[in-house]
Amino acid sequence: MAKRSLASLNAGDLSGKRVLVRVDFNVPLNDAGAITDDTRIRAALPTINDLIGKGAKVILSAHFGRPKGQVNDAMRLTPVAARLSELLGKPVAKTDSCIGPDAEAKVGAMADGDVVLLENVRFFAEEEKNEAGFAEKLAGLAEVYVNDAFGAAHRAHASTEGVTKFLKPAVAGFLMEKELQYLQGAVDEPKRPLAAIVGGSKVSSKIGVLEALIDKCDKVLIGGGMIFTFYKARGLSVGKSLVEEDKLELAKELEAKAKAKGVELLLPTDVVLADNFAPDANSQVADVTAIPDGWMGLDIGPDAVKVFQAALADCQTVIWNGPMGVFEFEKFATGTNAIATTLAELSAKGCCTIIGGGDSVAAVEKAGLAEKMSHISTGGGASLELLEGKVLPGVAALNDAA
């Protein structure tokens, strides 16, 4: 069921109203406490600017890091408020706490179009416990609720789920709406052929996604460290490569399931090997049937890249989650970069390309190709759970579209 969106509320509905907006401002900081990547802050601007334009009083709620329910000065949102103020070109007041006298006073002093950022909501243990009394206090600051934090939508926390019991309407912000439109659309009503590229080091972290995607896709391409568990399950020698011994049977089952469903499941035909796990390791390319002892696979090989490119050539929708190799090491980033380039080229031809959160987003940004993709998801765990077909509590709690 589609969710009600912020687009359904006009200036008449919002002017002078206090609107609580849950945003995802969990940005990386360097040792000096400066923001190194403001993508998540910029991603929330369309929603914030829309509310300012409609004369709302914009109260932002966010978490940062994992303070474990206690005040931690290193995890205050002060640098975020400063950066947001620069991006909006107007002052952003920050409260000392997300509830209590200071928050109430600053919200009470707001004029229409003002923006207040509540302090880190995870300074209270009640947030992650979704405690009703805490949710009611948070909701008490506002009259309308907007959830634009897709990256936290898979959590049933007070600021993502609990507050909706006390605030109506509860609607999706523009970022949340876009995420649902692309990710749910890709799974529920994709333009076919639909391919998924799944990478990363462990099968265990992607089991649910692989099972769900084999159900829905025409082609599933697997890369990253997890390929060696599949090879070992086939009886191949994998040298020192990463293998999850307890997942060998599962790898066999996934291959059998794909075969039974007529889904093309592709594993790399060759790999780039290293003699140790280091950026300057000695390397060689080997066929997957001839991996020598003492070597470990850190990237997909040049032949595998060609096979993957050929498989993707006719696809109309491609979902990518997880790198093809250890892309942090330049020597072993070739496979990942090649896939990023291929998807950028497919996008230009009208294919819908979706980068499903996590390391693949970092890889696409590192390759300078982020702008070329149809959609880059801001959620890691939330993207995976949505692709698995799970219900996200933060989404389920919003009002349904009329």
Swiss-Prot record:
Q: Which InterPro entries match?
A: Phosphoglycerate_kinase (IPR001576), Phosphoglycerate_kinase_CS (IPR015911), Phosphoglycerate_kinase_N (IPR015824), Phosphoglycerate_kinase_sf (IPR036043)
List the GO terms this entry assigns under cellular component, sorted alphabetically: cytosol
In terms of superkingdom, the source organism counts as Bacteria
Copy the pathway line from the protein's UniProt record: Carbohydrate degradation; glycolysis; pyruvate from D-glyceraldehyde 3-phosphate: step 2/5
Indicate yes or no for the key word Cytoplasm. yes
Q: Which EC main class describes this enzyme? A: transferase
Q: Which residues form the signal peptide?
A: none
Q: What is its EC number?
A: 2.7.2.3
Q: Which GO terms describe its biological process?
A: gluconeogenesis; glycolytic process
Q: Where in the cell is it found?
A: Cytoplasm
Q: Which PANTHER family match?
A: PHOSPHOGLYCERATE KINASE, PHOSPHOGLYCERATE KINASE 1, CHLOROPLASTIC-RELATED
Q: How does it assemble?
A: Monomer.
Give the family, as the similarity comment puts it: Belongs to the phosphoglycerate kinase family.
Name assigned to this protein:
Phosphoglycerate kinase
Q: Which organism is it from?
A: Synechococcus sp. (strain WH7803)
Q: Which gene encodes it?
A: pgk
